[in-house]
């Protein structure tokens, strides 16, 4: 059934992720085969924050050996799936799991230590370079990328402290991974800080350019200085007049256009938007339907911003909405629904939301005639068979 939902809403592509440690299970092997058989192109990411506990016990990403362990895992995945998967990403949002896992302590392994963040950042970059080499050696013609959560980092106020804090977060969030991977150097604000963890030749090992830039984008960050935080900065609030989603994130579609242009100008890579969407307080109405107009409004404004960026020169090749289904979110469990398909968790019943039908129309229109997308976005959602 889920494969049919993909065909209806977004024919041609799905972005599932492997789980390190169980990726050779029959469940994931059969799943990959099933997607290909259903004429769905899988875009597979090797790492979505699920480090095996056994490796975590050995230091996880603070252990330099983790880079080679990851390369071995990439080689195994290439041999298992390379005959049916041609698009691989090494990591999903490395800035999130390193900064939030080792700096803020919000995600696993729950560490708050600025030095550990830098160590983890460097080792993840080494793992990326080693995995790119392994995948290219094992899968001829493979198309490779890394998926970055990237957004503008704006000061919460005009104070010099907040301005400096925003610049510091920008270096970690937006530059710590794509800069060494694509440009062969760390951002200026991180160059000296990462030096203690570098060995001769490391930047060359990391600098394994990929074929495309994967972008996850939701909203800009508003940043404030926070001396009590080990990182020296924290997250502030957007101005009061900025709309917010039900999860509290600012809704500012112009930030997506700004981000796409910045990526294009700095890295000159084809860009695929691999996550973009919003949480909404969805419920099944008396007619058995889910009317999620706020999500349609969000997607309309953000896809319009994306097409503005394309007209301004950004080389955007594709767009994936987050997400096909309501699912478990890292920071909020099942309390926030991002899907264009409603999932009744006790029964697992799927109910396409109003946004599902709107999005299916949008994708079909954009595929045939991109300039038609704004006109299409203004039309009410209709049922799609």
Pin down the residues of each PLM region:
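Active-site region of glycoside hydrolase catalytic domains
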Residues: 2-36, 40-385
